[in-house]
């Protein structure tokens, strides 16, 4: 079996086929058989194989399914018809658990049916498209499927094994979009619910059925509306129920109209009272208000709102005691503005814009603007705080240029060359005596260059050792000396042996 795993290409994609005999894990080869794998995976996602039977089982050979009709001749692919075979040189029917497409005993006739092999099937090579294999212990569930009882035409006997559902754990094609399949006529008919029929009481089965039936009739008569002689007799002098209903509706409509008229009259009276109160608070009781211009009307409305807020007690909150003390002055100024034309309207708009662009110099000016501007007083507490925050923010925005200029000047002073006016560096050593602090000029501290005298011993090149005093160790020289010494000892020994002896 080791040669099988070496020759077969790696898989990509996994599907679990849940059957009545247990789950079957199927791994796919989308690179080697892209059309077949795409067809199989999309049909699984659409639930095409759910509750379909294995219509053909041959023990020791194969288990075939994928036909929704269960006849062995049905089934359709996602391409709208049959599609071509896909053969690969490294995919063969060399062992059990191979998953391949079933065809109509002719090439390029693949649909939706597929089969699992139960053993080695060499004679099917190059005839059926292989697109997957069964992995893990689920191969034993497949073998149990192959052991079911079958008839003479290889059809499993009842109950036939089924595909309950299919789960796609790893989809090799991310662009697959499941289709919305049309429902069959049987399913649509089952979904149409019949209207519930009212059950009929079978009173004849009871011993007291006749009495119960009479009671039912009496109740039915009581439920009916009681009719008067006006409705029963056909007399034109008598009014029918319809006529009385019409009169009742007419009277109701009249009541509604009268109520509406009363409400409208109340609204008009309230508006008149309101207009009189406005004229009283402003102080203009004359009837010739038509010639009043829009500016005066705006001033009147502002003063009216301010007076109403004073009566309610909703005065603008002051952040400091200074603002509280100046609240009386603000009220006096507001009353003076109400007598004459608003000074706010007489000021040119360009002056106000220049004030906004320049920003307000201090919080005192901001307080002055708050008292002077009647529009700001009309705001509530939160809105007024937000407007003041905007003014302060606008004031701070004008100081950015000056702050940046000061920062740049400081950088230039720091980066100046640390030399004195005589362009001679001042050397400070650790042994220098301290100078009197009273006579020291602190303005020249940036012109000082800190420099220390070099310490001996730290500079490796300042040693005074004699290079000839170093001892040189040469291993080869030492080895040669040893050899020379041995030769000298041997020569001396030889001389001692031949000493005192003649050559004759």
From Swiss-Prot:
Ion transport found in the keyword field: no
Tissue specificity: Ubiquitous.
Coiled coil: 204-274
Gene null: resulting phenotype: Increased susceptibility to P.syringae infection.
EC category name: isomerase
Catalytic reaction equation(s): [protein]-peptidylproline (omega=180) = [protein]-peptidylproline (omega=0)
Chain intervals for the UniProt region annotation (Disordered): 237-374, 416-441, 482-504
Residue ranges of domain PPIase cyclophilin-type in the record: 16-167
EC number(s) given by UniProt: 5.2.1.8
GO cellular component entries: cytoplasm; nucleus; plasmodesma
An annotated GO BP: protein folding
Keyword match Lipoprotein: no
PROSITE patterns referenced in this protein's UniProt entry, alphabetically: CSA_PPIASE_1, CSA_PPIASE_2
Keywords annotated in UniProt: Acetylation, Chaperone, Coiled coil, Cytoplasm, Isomerase, Nucleus, Rotamase
Top-level taxon of origin: Eukaryota
UniProt biased composition (Polar residues): 416-434
GO molecular-function term, one example from the UniProt record: peptidyl-prolyl cis-trans isomerase activity
UniProt cross-references to InterPro entries, sorted A to Z: Cyclophilin-like_dom_sf, Cyclophilin-type_PPIase_CS, Cyclophilin-type_PPIase_dom, Cyclophilin_A-like
Basic and acidic residues compositional bias, start-end: 237-275, 344-354, 364-374, 494-504
Annotated compartments: Nucleus; Cytoplasm
Summary of the function given for this chain in its UniProt record: PPIases accelerate the folding of proteins. It catalyzes the cis-trans isomerization of proline imidic peptide bonds in oligopeptides. Involved in plant response to pathogen infection by increasing PAD4 expression in absence of EDS1 up-regulation.
Recorded family membership: Belongs to the cyclophilin-type PPIase family.
Protein name per Swiss-Prot or TrEMBL: Peptidyl-prolyl cis-trans isomerase CYP57
Native source species: Arabidopsis thaliana (Mouse-ear cress)
Gene: CYP57
């Amino acid at each position: 079996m080791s040669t099988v795993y070496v020759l077969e290409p790696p898989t990509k994609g996994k599907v679990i086929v849940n059957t009545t005999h247990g789950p079957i894990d199927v791994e796919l080869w989308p690179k080697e058989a892209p059309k077949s794998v795409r067809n199989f995976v999309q049909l699984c996602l659409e639930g095409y194989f759910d509750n379909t039977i294995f219509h053909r089982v041959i023990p020791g050979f194969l288990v075939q399914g994928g036909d929704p009709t269960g006849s062995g001749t049905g089934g359709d692919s996602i391409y709208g018809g049959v599609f071509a075979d896909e053969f690969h040189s490294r995919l063969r029917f060399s062992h059990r658990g191979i998953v391949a497409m079933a065809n109509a005993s002719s090439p390029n006739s693949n649909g939706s049916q597929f089969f699992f092999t139960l053993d080695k099937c060499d004679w099917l090579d190059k005839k059926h498209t292989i697109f997957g294999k069964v992995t893990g212990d689920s191969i034993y569930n497949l073998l149990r499927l192959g052991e079911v009882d079958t008839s003479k035409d290889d059809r499993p006997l009842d109950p036939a094994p089924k595909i309950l559902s299919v789960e796609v754990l790893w989809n090799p094609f991310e662009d697959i979009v499941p289709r919305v399949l049309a429902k069959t006529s049987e399913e649509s008919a089952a979904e149409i619910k019949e209207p519930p029929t009212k059950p009929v009481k079978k009173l004849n089965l009871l011993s007291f059925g006749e009495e119960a039936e009479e009671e039912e009739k009496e109740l039915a008569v009581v439920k009916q509306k009681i009719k008067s002689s006006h409705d029963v007799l056909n007399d034109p002098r008598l009014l029918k129920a319809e006529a009385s209903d019409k009169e009742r509706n007419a009277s109701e409509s009249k009541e509604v109209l009268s109520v509406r008229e009363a409400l409208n009259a109340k609204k008009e009276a309230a508006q008149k009272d309101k207009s009189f109160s406005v004229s009283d608070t402003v102080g203009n009781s004359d009837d010739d208000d038509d010639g009043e211009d829009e500016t005066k009307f705006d001033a009147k409305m502002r003063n009216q709102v301010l007076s109403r807020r004073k009566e309610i007690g909703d005065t603008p909150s002051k952040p400091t005691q200074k603002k509280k003390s100046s609240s009386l002055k603000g009220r006096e100024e507001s009353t003076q503005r109400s007598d004459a034309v608003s000074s706010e309207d007489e000021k040119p708009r360009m002056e106000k814009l220049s004030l906004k662009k320049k920003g307000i110099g201090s919080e005192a000016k901001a307080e002055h603007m708050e008292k002077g501007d009647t529009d700001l007083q009309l705001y509530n507490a939160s809105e007024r705080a937000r407007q003041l925050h905007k003014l302060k923010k606008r004031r701070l925005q004008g100081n950015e240029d000056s702050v940046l200029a000061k920062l740049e000047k400081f950088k230039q002073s720091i980066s100046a060359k640390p030399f004195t006016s005589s362009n001679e560096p001042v050397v400070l050593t650790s042994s220098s005596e301290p100078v009197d602090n009273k006579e020291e000029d602190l303005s020249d501290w940036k012109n000082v260059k800190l420099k220390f005298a070099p310490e001996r011993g730290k500079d490796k090149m300042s040693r005074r050792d004699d290079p000839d005093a170093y001892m040189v160790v040469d291993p080869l020289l030492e080895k040669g000396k040893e050899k020379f010494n041995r030769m000298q000892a041997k020569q001396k020994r030889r001389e001692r042996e031949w000493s005192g002896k003649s050559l004759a």
